[in-house]
Curated annotation (Swiss-Prot):
The 26S proteasome consists of a 20S proteasome core and two 19S regulatory subunits. The 20S proteasome core is a barrel-shaped complex made of 28 subunits that are arranged in four stacked rings. The two outer rings are each formed by seven alpha subunits, and the two inner rings are formed by seven beta subunits. The proteolytic activity is exerted by three beta-subunits PSMB5, PSMB6 and PSMB7. PSMA5 interacts directly with the PSMG1-PSMG2 heterodimer which promotes 20S proteasome assembly. Glycans are attached at residue 198. It is found in: Cytoplasm; Nucleus. Belongs to the peptidase T1A family. It comes from Rattus norvegicus. The modification Phosphoserine is found at residues 16, 56, 63. GO terms for cellular component: cytoplasm; nucleus; proteasome complex; proteasome core complex; proteasome core complex, alpha-subunit complex. Gene3D superfamilies: Glutamine Phosphoribosylpyrophosphate, subunit 1, domain 1. The gene is Psma5. This is Proteasome subunit alpha type-5. The modification Phosphothreonine is found at residue 55. The lineage of its organism: Eukaryota, Metazoa, Chordata, Craniata, Vertebrata. GO terms for biological process: proteasome-mediated ubiquitin-dependent protein catabolic process.
Length: 241
């Protein structure tokens, strides 16, 4: 006799008769409550743009980090439970440094994503990695960087599944943003056009008026390190949209 749905809910490693892991599905839905993030890959580099939700005028906007540097050639944008993201970010940073010390070369964007994916898959295991949790991570990540294959963009969801993308949106307005990306993206898109498109789409889906304090923007280009836009640089870019 099959258990009820609520009883399948309690076990993170138990499949339902329909072949579903409800806790993983809930985590995937949970990350959609986070702020919207957009990543676009071009031949000139990768851009990451994220909405920052300032819930109180007493909050310091600069203390909210939605885009972080993994290594000099890789950045990461997040949406969902930021505390969960910190664990995955730490894992990615440790992996890139260990790879450098061991092989004297930078780690590829795909390998970094794979390492983080392996940790995300270890939920509920007794002998798992020390960073693993007893439940799925409630966060989706966009890894953007440049390696020997050129500019790369990877999306990883809470199930640990990752896939390479030309352009991707995650977060609360991801469906509308993804539709807009499909309309504006083409293989010949320049980095400047990608930056402009990502901000225009964020402007369309954000509830508040877009300004230099409620978004974050970063780029990674061949031959150049990860670059996070300053408030002054953001104001210049926003003037053009």
């Amino acid at each position: 006799m099959f258990l009820t749905r609520s009883e399948y809910d309690r076990g993170v490693n138990t499949f339902s008769p329909e072949g579903r892991l409800f806790q993983v599905e809930y985590a995937i839905e949970g990350h959609k409550l986070g702020s919207t993030a957009i990543g676009i890959q071009t031949s000139e580099g990768v851009c990451l743009a994220v909405e920052k939700r300032i819930t109180s005028p007493l909050m310091e906007p600069s203390s909210i980090e939605k885009i972080v540097e993994i290594d000099a050639h890789i950045g990461c944008a997040m949406s969902g439970l930021i505390a969960d993201a910190k664990t995955l970010i730490d894992k990615a940073r440790v992996e890139t440094q260990n790879h450098w010390f061991t092989y004297n070369e930078t780690m590829t964007v795909e390998s970094v994503t794979q390492a983080v994916s392996n940790l995300a898959l270890q939920f509920g295991e007794e002998d798992a990695d020390p960073g693993a949790m007893s439940r799925p991570f409630g966060v989706a990540l966009l890894f953007g960087g440049v390696d020997e294959k050129g500019p790369q963009l990877f999306h990883m969801d809470p199930s640990g599944t990752f896939v390479q993308c030309d352009a991707r949106a995650i977060g609360s307005a991801s469906e509308g943003a993804q539709s807009s990306l499909q309309e504006v993206y083409h293989k010949s898109t320049t980095l400047k056009e990608a930056i402009k498109s990502s901000l225009i789409i964020l402007k369309q889906v954000m509830e508040e008026k877009l300004n230099a304090t409620n978004i974050e923007l970063a780029t990674v280009q061949p031959g150049q390190n990860f670059h996070m836009f300053t408030k002054e640089e953001l104001e210049e870019v926003i003037k053009d949209i």
